[in-house]
């Protein structure tokens, strides 16, 4: 009798295969943690954070995928066919990294601040979290602490209970190389990050 293949938890080796440069393998991934090139338009920023388990311990083998709009608020994707927002040929809009090569288990993305999409959504980053023990990947977002007015008007963020919104808002800091936004992703516990059913 034919049936659906049963689901399994995500294993510990997927991040090594999909982010080989981070884990110092000889072959390289086509997708890394840098979304910017020398000609990319927009304000350069760095995103840093950790994935924390239910005990508050950093997860060393999680993988994060990020996709975002460019500085003009347009995605580099065929489904975004708006002509009022310009495409940036030097901005891919997608990146992937793991958490396990440094002592702090940080994920780091070098990118630009995304523009507003024009549909009321505040500038934000879309994330997918994959890690051992999950039956499926999880979707979340990162908003920016210095976009308070735009965040207050965002229709997606407005659906999140006010006492949970802080789990989606990265805090701005000035690092040695420029602007850094920091946000940890909590998988469980009282500070559990809001995940979306997409």
What residue ranges belong to the model's regions?
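Beta-strand-dominated extracellular/periplasmic modules and repeats
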Residues: 1-198
């Amino acid at each position: 009798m034919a049936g659906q293949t049963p689901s399994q938890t995500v294993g510990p080796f997927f991040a090594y295969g999909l982010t080989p440069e981070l884990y110092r393998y000889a072959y390289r991934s086509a997708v890394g943690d840098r979304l910017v090139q020398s000609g990319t338009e927009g304000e350069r920023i760095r995103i840093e954070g950790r994935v924390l388990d239910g005990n508050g311990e950093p997860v060393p083998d999680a993988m994060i995928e990020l996709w975002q709009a460019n500085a003009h608020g347009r995605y580099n994707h065929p489904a975004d066919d708006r002509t009022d927002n310009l495409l940036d040929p030097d901005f891919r809009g997608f990146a992937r990294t793991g958490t396990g090569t440094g002592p702090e288990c940080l994920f780091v993305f070098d990118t630009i601040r995304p523009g507003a999409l024009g549909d009321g959504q505040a500038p934000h980053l879309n994330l997918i979290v994959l890690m051992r023990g999950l039956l499926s990947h999880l979707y979340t977002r990162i908003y920016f602490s210095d976009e308070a007015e735009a965040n207050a008007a965002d229709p997606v963020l407005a659906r999140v209970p006010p006492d949970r919104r802080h789990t989606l808002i990265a805090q701005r800091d000035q690092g040695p190389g420029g602007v850094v936004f920091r946000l940890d992703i909590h998988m469980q516990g009282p500070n559990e990050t809001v995940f979306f059913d997409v």
